[in-house]
Amino acid sequence: MHKSILATAVLLGCLVFASGCAVGRRTLPLTVSQTPGLGATKGTVFIGEVADSRRFENKPQLPSVPSIDGDVTKATKEQLANVIGRQRNSYGGALGDIGLPENDTVMNRTRQLIEEGFRRKGYAIGTDPAAATAATVVIDEFWAWVTPGMWSISFEANVTCKLTVTKDGNTKTFTVRGYAINKGQAATNPNWQKAYQAAFDDFLVQFDRTLTNAGL
């Protein structure tokens, strides 16, 4: 009886993941929600370099650590800049990569997040490096992972950045993190996207709070 129940549970888990097509590379488009800002009440901000400093590992023990389907030491920075997660089988084993669409990168997505955050705070986005307010960004984490469960799957996403802002000659550095978890029944694009969208939304809330506390 117990063996029958276990076999059924394993079969259901396999079917759930199979319905998500976890084999091979998955392409996952991501968007940043936009809301009406306050207008340019605080002037213009120039956003300079957005750098990817995520650390990838070969066969990490935790799914929350970035990895690829292959040898990370042989991957170029350009290839890694597109990877945002790994798929898993019903036992938690790593499968194919999850990547942004061709020609998109974590730097592009993060820049859009930072721009949206500044707009909501009342800044216009400028192109002059000599602007009174300027910012640079270092991406520490931009990753999603999945944890299989008996009756549902947990999709988690984490976006963490170091933000350096210089305003009127004064420089401050902050860490901003957005995190979210989404429970779903199948490893499909919408479930991955819901996790990322919620993490983006949380990031923007934390961004607003961080700048407010800094008087920016």
Where are the regions that the model predicts?
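Bacterial N-terminal signal peptides that target proteins for export
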Residues: 1-9
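Bacterial N-terminal signal peptides
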Residues: 9-18
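A structural "domain/chain start" motif
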Residues: 21-108, 212-216
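Surface-exposed short loop/turn segments
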Residues: 25-30, 116, 120-171
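Generic short beta-strand segments
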Residues: 50-54, 138-144, 177-181
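Sec/Tat-exported extracytoplasmic proteins
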Residues: 54, 110, 114-122, 143-146, ...
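Short secondary-structure boundary motifs at beta->alpha junctions and helix caps
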Residues: 80-101, 168-215
